Amino acid sequence: MAHKKAGGSTRNGRDSESKRLGVKMYGGQVIKPGNIIVRQRGTEFHAGYGVGMGKDHTLFAKIEGVIKFEKKGEFMRRYVSIVAA
């Protein structure tokens, strides 16, 4: 009679699904209203002119134009704006 003792179960083998965060459209690119520019957790980038912010801090275009990334203000915050083309 062939017997094999059962192996123990493992406690590994899990990982969370990636959230696909990051910059989706870059400076100089032409963008349309509603297009996503940045997906982020918190305000790594702030919304400038022509850019809206969703409840999960996603930045999206409100107008058509060209994307511009800039640092400004006392704390040199990074802003994303849209320059009308």
Swiss-Prot record:
An example Gene Ontology CC term for this record: cytosolic large ribosomal subunit
Region (Disordered): 1-21
Domain of life, per lineage: Bacteria
InterPro entries attached to this UniProt entry: Ribosomal_bL27, Ribosomal_bL27_CS
Molecular function GO labels: structural constituent of ribosome
GO biological process: translation
Protein name as annotated: Large ribosomal subunit protein bL27
